């Protein structure tokens, strides 16, 4: 199959990478796993056993007229322990390489079908100027975009840093969430070739 390149000849690409059927269930599983892996999971509270304080009974069991109490670390006391204390958790989910690559291929194929993948010969800036980048995107009739290049161009990265709806990644930095988060995905010819090599 062929991908149209802006201002250049069409690029022949592999149908297994850019012409794959849309697999919603697989994409959902991989996106959920990716988001789960990004969770910090470091929350921690103390149970009554872990709270610092005496284990002595505050007053005798009977005869005072007060409610019975075992120690000052009881969860119903101020500064006592937490009943079901949260502990650090690993939220990551296992996704094997075949599934991950399949999801990326499925997303790329759907971007092609929806005309959301814009292929350009090259995409670089002479200086880190946001104004120049905005104009370049206007020329492509794009506002909300993920820009994928073969290697990270520092000028491009710095120019895009101040734009809320624009992100710049190299091929190694793409992930399923960022691919579906933007209206358009601008990708260079060299980046397309790299993606094909990685996903082959």
Curated annotation (Swiss-Prot):
What would be an example GO MF term here?
rRNA binding
A single Gene Ontology biological process assigned to it is: response to antibiotic
Write out the ranges of the annotated region (Disordered).
43-67
Keyword Magnesium in record: no
Q: Is Ribonucleoprotein set as a keyword in this record?
A: yes
- Known consequence of changing residue 65 to D? In strain: S27 and S47; confers macrolide resistance
Q: Which GO terms describe its cellular component?
A: ribonucleoprotein complex; ribosome
Q: Name one Pfam family in it.
A: Ribosomal_L4
Superkingdom classification of source: Bacteria
Keyword entries, A-Z: Antibiotic resistance, Repressor, Ribonucleoprotein, Ribosomal protein, RNA-binding, rRNA-binding, Transcription, Transcription regulation, Transcription termination, Translation regulation
Mind telling me which InterPro entries this protein's record contains? Ribosomal_uL4, Ribosomal_uL4-like, Ribosomal_uL4_dom_sf
Tell me the PANTHER family matching this sequence. Answer: 50S RIBOSOMAL PROTEIN L4 (PTHR10746), LARGE RIBOSOMAL SUBUNIT PROTEIN UL4M (PTHR10746:SF6)
HAMAP family registered for this protein in UniProt? Ribosomal_uL4_B
Relate the assembly described in the record: Part of the 50S ribosomal subunit.
Functionally, this protein is described as follows: One of the primary rRNA binding proteins, this protein initially binds near the 5'-end of the 23S rRNA. It is important during the early stages of 50S assembly. It makes multiple contacts with different domains of the 23S rRNA in the assembled 50S subunit and ribosome. Protein L4 is a both a transcriptional repressor and a translational repressor protein. It regulates transcription of the S10 operon (to which L4 belongs) by causing premature termination of transcription within the S10 leader. L4 controls the translation of the S10 operon by binding to its mRNA.
Q: Which family does it belong to?
A: Belongs to the universal ribosomal protein uL4 family.
Query: What is the name attached to this protein's record?
Result: Large ribosomal subunit protein uL4
Species lineage, top-down?
Bacteria, Pseudomonadati, Pseudomonadota, Gammaproteobacteria, Pasteurellales
């Amino acid at each position: 199959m062929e991908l149209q390149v802006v201002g250049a000849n069409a690029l022949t690409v592999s149908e297994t990478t850019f012409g794959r059927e849309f697999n919603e269930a697989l994409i959902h599983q991989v996106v959920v796993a990716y988001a789960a892996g990004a969770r910090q999971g470091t929350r921690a509270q103390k149970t009554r056993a872990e709270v610092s304080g005496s284990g002595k009974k505050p007053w005798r069991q009977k005869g005072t007229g007060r409610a019975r109490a075992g120690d000052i670390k009881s969860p119903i006391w101020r500064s006592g322990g937490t009943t079901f204390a949260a502990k650090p958790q690993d939220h990551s989910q296992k996704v094997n390489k075949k599934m991950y690559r399949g999801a990326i291929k499925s997303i790329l194929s759907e971007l092609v079908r929806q005309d959301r993948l814009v292929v350009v010969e090259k995409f670089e800036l002479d200086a880190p100027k946001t104004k120049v980048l905005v104009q370049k995107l206007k020329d492509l009739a794009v506002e909300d975009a993920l820009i994928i290049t073969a290697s990270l161009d520092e000028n491009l990265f710095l120019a895009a840093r101040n734009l809320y709806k624009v992100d710049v990644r190299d091929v190694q930095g793409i992930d399923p969430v960022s691919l579906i988060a933007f209206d358009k995905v601008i990708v260079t010819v060299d980046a397309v070739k790299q993606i094909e090599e990685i996903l082959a």
